[in-house]
Amino acid sequence: MKKIILICIIYTGVVINAFSTDFVTYQLPNGLTVYLWEDHNQPSVYGSVVFRAGSVDEPKEFTGLAHYLEHVLFKGTQKIGALDWQKEKVHYDNIISLYDEYAETTDPQKRTELEKKINEESIEAAKYSFTNEFSNLVQSIGGDGLNAGTSYDQTVYYNNFPAFQLEKWLDLYAERFESPVFRTFQAELENVFEEYNMYEDMNMTHIRKFLFSYLYAGHPYSREIIGAYEHLKNPRLSKLIEFYNTWYVPNNMALILVGNFKTEDAIPLIEAKFSHLERKTLPERPVYTEADFSNNPKFSAKLGYSPMVLLGYKTVPIKHEDTYLLDFCANLLTNSMQTGLLDKITMEGEVQYAGATLDSRRDQGRFLIQAVPYYDVNQRLYESDKATEKIIMHEIEKLKQGNIDDWLIESVKSSMLRQNELMIENARSKAGLLQTIFVYQLPENYYRSLADKIKAVTKDDIQRITQQYLTGNHLTISIETGKPKKNKLTKPDIKPVEQPQGTQSEYATRFKSIPVIDVKSVYNDFNEVKHADLYKGVRLHYTVNPLNDYFSLTLRYGVGTEKMPMLEYAVQLMNSAGIMPVDDAQTVRRRFSELNASCTFSVTDDYLYINLIGSEEKLEEICRLMTRLTLLPKLDDKQKDRIIGTEISYRLMTETKDANVLGNALLDYVRYKDKSDYIDRMTLTEIFGLKISELTGEIIRATDYELDIHYVGKKSFKEVVKLLGENLPLKEGVKTTESPFVKECVTYDKPTIYFLPNKEVQQAQLYFYFNGKPYSIDQEVDYNAFVEYFSGSFNGLVMQEIREKNSMAYTASAGFRKPPLPGKNTYFLGYIGTQSDKAADAIDIFMRLLNNMPQYQERIGDIKMYLKQAYLSGKPSFRNKSRIFDDWLKLGYTDDPAKVHMDKIDNLQFSDIIEFYEQNVKNQNVAIVIMGDPKIIDLKRIETSYGKITKLSTGKLFSKE
């Protein structure tokens, strides 16, 4: 506290409040709110700027402005990216005027002419700017994770960066919001349209639209954040500028820093960089009427792959004093420990799924319950919505009558307290907490006081809250199976925007001259993890927990579904298993909750996992309970039927319709042919015939394999070795693991094209694949340098050529996938999601990048800086340290990869990237994989350019049932 007082004395221009030892918050005279949370367990700093403005603040005639603004605030300012602002401004002003005229014009021919004029002005303006300079500068300081997000009540911009680059990061972000220029607006609109297309192909988008239109009727919360279709097609740049000038002001803005920095270093820099931003009077927000739920309105729509029932109750805004109690009640219904009332009816097979959540926002709130009716595997029919709703209402009534056990209340208390404590182990989660405090104007001690409030919750509180908010009128939404109607967008006739290369703004020159502190590199020390062999093939990995009193314990058995396919279903049952002879699932969940612990089972192709987390003082009891569960599982036939029903209904009703599943199945087929996960799997007949005895035996057999135990906690190494050795289900003479299993990828001996016709999708999915060479850590820097140049974030060629220059896609990516073991092959995978009428153009651009890669030598300095800082900042959290060290050892590292590769990074030349490209990428036999509408995609042009197209059907991609 003395340090904080001293800072107050020195920096009298700011008002500082340190309500706890966790973080410091203060305001600059212009109203900018600052949150600083030092955490020297973090390897870097997470920085964000958040605005208390989102889609609710848009004029109803111009929805989508907040989201548009998020996109174009990456395009620079009158300084960042400006090569000659005065010359550029002439064209920029013309573009603004043309968009105003465009918005007032309804004649299609006139609108086409205006689009052409805007395109011409954009091309001219681009001659005097370098649009991706901002992202290049972030890369030049070793920044990563650059992104932004828009929601109803807020918009946030963020990335990670090394602590010694603090001054540069602050300088860059202060300038970012000073005088932004919304460059290449026309091209970026196309990228937003592609984002819209992507969401249109997701069924949950249409379900959410339908739900929110009634749930928040009469409020902007009822509309989509991305904006209405008609508004997306009729943009107005002047309105975007007006929105920015209104809401993006310092007194509506917060700067958040979390991580490995010093508060006393940050405060004077923040004052110097951000104090000049001009404070403005904010408009008064309108007050909206609540939706009318009188007479229990019911609505239905045919939008889903399977039926669903949604119940909505009116509650309160997030700032209301009842919010935490409503959240507590939601946890009484469903929670991570599966002890809730709705968890119970799910585990008992009364429904396929049921869950509750609290949706609290600035102006209003809703309590939501979602349920999927029970699926009868014999009749292959769902239970009725009416019967499902009756089951749900019965559980809600228990809360209202206080008909709940005391242990459940205590279980929820311990779970919520534990989750809150674990959440602040992560820098981004901490920033999220501060962001919530700012956006919703919560008390600064909100999260600390929340713990005391949770501890004090009584059964009377629960009855009062549920009788007040979950009684009487509510909204019921029934989702039935059916196809949503989609809005079709067409490709505009606009030319690519070319930008100068090999140059930079005066700002960039000054920015790069800002001095940085010469810091000593700190590397990972493998000795921070201790090891002990408890038996042959049973190895303990021990890491100290420096933060709190919650241990984590992971048991990783050396076998997975690749060798034992039934484990997929056995593991699901283990998460709702009892213990023989008499303990049912709910009793087991209760016992874990009474020990303040959670226990979950999971499985991958390679490993079976048992994950425990809980109070350190109860470690021995928790381990004993888990051991009994593992050795004596009591699996239930009704649960088995529910799990089988979920799998059968998914395969019959969802997987051949869902665009993302189809895309994954198509890609899996191209990579693995008949060894695809969607083909080489248990059939429905086999699944339907599964017996409890088989599934129980599968779990027991899986625990016969080699075992790695990863413990993170505060007990001494010696104590842990003894305690775990005596209380875990350990075996002598375990089987040698064959994991990790690396599936053999197909190598194509000539260029190949596969096409899956799908007239239902709005967006074509394009993949580019070829098998690579055996991997060695000696080539690690070569792989990473090439990928950073070719497709690294916003700076890579893929995003620049596909998205920024040609407006082909919202999502475009590429890179090499590396195996978990040396000597196994890598493979290359590229992806573009684009409108079907752009597919042929997008393929041409990507193939040109692969076979005739542009060379911008000036990027090598930024790439080296990024790689260097990425390695140095690549320190695993204490929770994951032992597992990541183990993975590194498997690859052949005997020391921190950063230390191993630093000399090679320092000596990296652009010619090394070109050499890697020519040896590993150029003129490879690429498999081009396409899914989209055959009536719109120019297949003839693609076939003429790249060879014969092999047409596939969905039946080829999935196992025969």
Question: What residue spans do the PLM features occupy?
Answer:
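Proteolytic maturation boundary segments
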Residues: 19-33, 262-301, 338, 343, ...
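Carboxylate/His-rich catalytic cores and anion/metal-binding grooves
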Residues: 193-200
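Sec-dependent N-terminal signal peptides
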Residues: 4-14
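M16 family metallopeptidases and their MPP-like homologs
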Residues: 37, 42-55, 64-65, 82-175, ...
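A common structural junction motif
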Residues: 175-182, 274-281, 392-404, 627-637, ...
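Active-site recognition of the HExxH zinc-binding catalytic motif
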Residues: 63-71, 75, 564-572, 784, ...
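Metal-associated gating/positioning segment near the N- to mid-region
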Residues: 60, 72-84
